[in-house]
Amino acid sequence: GLIMDNFVLTCCSTVDLDEAFFKKRHIPFVCFHFRMDGVDYPDDLGHSISFKDFYDRIRNGATPTTSQVNSSEFIEFWEPFVKEGKNILHISLSSGISGVVNSAILAQKYLMEKYPGSVVKVVDSLGASSGYGMLVEYVADMKDEGKTLEECYEWAEEHKLNIHHWFFSTNLTSYRRGGRISSASFFLGQLLKICPLLNMDYLGRLIPRKKIRTKDKTIIETVNMMIEHAEDGTNYNGKCFICHSDCLDDAIKVKDLVESKFPNLKGKVRIYSVGTTIGSHTGPGTVARSEERRVGKECRSRWS
């Protein structure tokens, strides 16, 4: 067991975890970008612009646009490791919401040709935000246990659809702007205080599933979905992450309800901020919850 598999685990900034996570786990990440009020920023965990400021500007009418990591940025990001003789396992944001995995694959091919014998593997997480982050963390746990790159890669491919992602939103403005809902639905939704409940399907796309009146009912429903789908129901003993776009009170309500219904959780529910890439599309007022679930593909496809 002395020969450690010499590889680096990397991911995109869109895992929406915090800086402490990356430092503690030694996971380098590559930043998406966004443009707001004519200025370009990296999606860098709230460094260049605080999350509060970012979401306040959207509330005041700013319309940020995002751009993914291109292949030359991936090459720049990975090449120093490959030069040192390290192999790379990269877990990417879902191909269902971004073309970034294609950029990663172009860079992978380029580097493996330039450095014969090097290995770069890319996993399409089919997830987003802290559910995607959860997949990365599980793989980091395996890496720390001494599993090889190949073992980690195979596990991620086999289990990535076992992460369940549910989102709800209390502010429909950005959804209307992004064309996810029609103007008519938007006005009706505002009138009736409707919160759409969305999830990720088996192709990693964000799909509206239910329309629920009032936030409180939506919070109850999102936890009911967890009871229905989590492995072992309320005896679920895995992790649960919650991500919010500047609506901490709502995230705490979900956390409290989850912790009261699931006494055997692994650690407490962890709350993170939705970063600027995903947040450019959701706007403020979105809460995302993720956990592992009972069955693999069947569950996501049943909702698809």
Regions found by a protein language model. Give the residues of each.
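Glycine-rich phosphate- or other oxyanion-binding loops that anchor nucleotides, phosphorylated ligands
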Residues: 59-95, 102, 106, 153
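Short, flexible active-site-adjacent loop segments at beta-strand->alpha-helix junctions, enriched
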Residues: 94, 126, 299
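A short glycine/small-residue-enriched secondary-structure motif
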Residues: 48-55, 78, 83, 110
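Mixed-charge interfacial surface used for oligomerization/domain docking
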Residues: 6, 14-22, 27-33, 38, ...
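Short, Lys/Arg-enriched N-terminal segments with co-localized hydrophobic residues
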Residues: 1-3
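N-terminal glycine-rich anion-binding loop in soluble enzyme alpha/beta folds
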Residues: 8-73
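Single conserved hydrophobic/aromatic residue that forms the stacking wall/gate
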Residues: 292-304
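Short beta-strand/turn micro-motifs composed of small residues
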Residues: 11, 92, 244
